């Protein structure tokens, strides 16, 4: 860890500023520089033993170095491609793939959800980031380079983020890892025109469910093949 000196911007402003030099290199401890690489998680802690009311206060702020940030409330329209060379992608709250739109995610891409964060207060989980799909989601990983959907935390736990919800939209997942969410992959209100396919993937360490399909009319085609579903305490498949 490196230390940064913070200076208040003015008298009683409550705004503190500081800086540290960063370089893309191997870690060297205590050299006054922060060595980083693309996708590294940067976390800043500020602790005040006596805040405004005499009580100890602490502030934590987290960001990803060289990440594509997809902000809470983003709506994806038309055809959109996410790829490893433009990633990782940091989702800070609920994101919607609109009806008629297609989001394609290519092999090796990391999609990271900011833990316990959602300013939209919407979706299935009001206080956690989710990827909601009313259009089409195609996730095409490979055995050598799967697509990862995971938490922003360095020490992640189940329930850090909401999950991937197909709200009457279709979803195809091949060589995908979904971990540390609340409900994993959730098909809601699907019918015969909204297939959900999960192949050669890993669904693990989610708080409640691994893969769910409910509230449809019974005609939806759901295919799960060659997939490891483990440590999803309520149900692996529901």
Language-model features: locations:
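Short, aromatic- and glycine-rich surface loops/edge beta-strands on solvent-exposed regions
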Residues: 32-49
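Aromatic sugar-binding surface patches on proteins
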Residues: 9-35
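Anionic, low-complexity intrinsically disordered segments
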Residues: 7, 43-46, 59
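Beta-strand/loop edge motif enriched in small/polar residues
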Residues: 31, 65-238
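Short beta-strand elements
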Residues: 52-68
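Extended low-complexity, serine/threonine- and proline-enriched intrinsically disordered segments
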Residues: 1-5, 10
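Short acidic/polar inter-strand loop motif in beta-rich domains
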Residues: 27, 48-55
